[in-house]
Amino acid sequence: MEHIFLELRSPGPDLFQLGPFSLRWYGLLIAISVLVGLNLSSELASKKGLKKSLINDLLPILVLASVIGARIYYVAFEWRNYTGKNFWSSINFLNLNIPLPSALEIWGGGIAIHGALIMGTLSIIFFCRWRKEPFWDVIDVLVPSVALGQAIGRWGNFFNNEAFGIPTNLPWKLFIPYRFRPEIFSTQDYFHPTFLYESVWNIFVFGILIFLFRKSNKKELKLPPGSLSCLYLITYSLGRFWIEGLRTDPLCLGGVPPFCEGGLRIAQLISLFLISAGLLGIWRIYVSKKALPDPSSINGRNQ
């Protein structure tokens, strides 16, 4: 039996176009993620007893660092697609073709969450050292927003017809136009909607984090600083490891695309590292009964 009514099909990357200007779904979803994250993190920070202005002051630095990190990370592992004849591209502005390095065309897609996490974390360390804020308290109020923002942002992959999985005929199958399919699957029409899997998984992660935060805020549960951050690393990375195994466009360390034959899937490797880091953090907090070292403090101790 065909379940055509459940078929997913992207309407395209552009929400609307006005003359030379266009609004892309990808950019809109990122903007929505930022706004939702700002409001949620500000509310959680206030309940945590942090300064009300903290999130507003941190957000511009965090967003800029995260976007830059996400793009650099992606381009670094896909460098072959941005060299030689592919190095230059152009944008049309008022009927003028302006040359631009293709690596800067972030609006066309091609960002990686792990790059955003790395640069975003570094920016928080810098900010907390500068403002003398407690690093783990700050990052604990941010991770629920990160999970929710990822759930929203993943839909940008849907509109761009990217980051999809291997062929499938499941009821929730995703139709991919011919020009976006890997050559090996050129005759296949339907694929796993891995963007949807990750979006749903991130909502699940968000639910766990916000539930525990509220329990802690009501004094019904004791959560030492860093607990939510470690839990985020573990839960998000578990889902990402599985979902990455379905994708046809993984970033590879060596190997042959689209399945990194003879090489490694970078996201799975990073996920294993993050799971290990999260478990070590939980062990230190709850078994060794020691506070996590504060990376924003010069001596590594909590401020």
Swiss-Prot record:
Give the EC class as a word.
Answer: transferase
| Source organism, top-level taxon | Bacteria
Q: Can you name a GO cellular component term? A: plasma membrane
One MF term in the entry's GO annotations: phosphatidylglycerol-prolipoprotein diacylglyceryl transferase activity
Membrane-spanning ranges: 18-38, 58-78, 106-126, 133-153, 193-213, 223-243, 266-286
Q: What keywords is this UniProt entry annotated with?
A: Cell inner membrane, Cell membrane, Membrane, Transferase, Transmembrane, Transmembrane helix
Q: Which Pfam families match?
A: LGT (PF01790)
Q: Does the keyword section mention Magnesium? A: no
Give the GO terms filed under biological process for this record: lipoprotein biosynthetic process
Q: How does it sit in the membrane?
A: Multi-pass membrane protein
Known pathway: Protein modification; lipoprotein biosynthesis (diacylglyceryl transfer)
Taking the first listed entry, what is the main subcellular location of this protein, grouped into a coarse class? membrane
* Enzyme Commission no: 2.5.1.145
Q: Which cysteines are joined by disulfide bonds?
A: none
Please list the residues that bind a 1,2-diacyl-sn-glycero-3-phospho-(1'-sn-glycerol): R154
Which family, according to the similarity comment?
Belongs to the Lgt family.
Q: So what does this one do?
A: Catalyzes the transfer of the diacylglyceryl group from phosphatidylglycerol to the sulfhydryl group of the N-terminal cysteine of a prolipoprotein, the first step in the formation of mature lipoproteins.
Please give the HAMAP family that the UniProt record associates with this protein: Lgt
Q: How is this protein named in the record?
A: Phosphatidylglycerol--prolipoprotein diacylglyceryl transferase
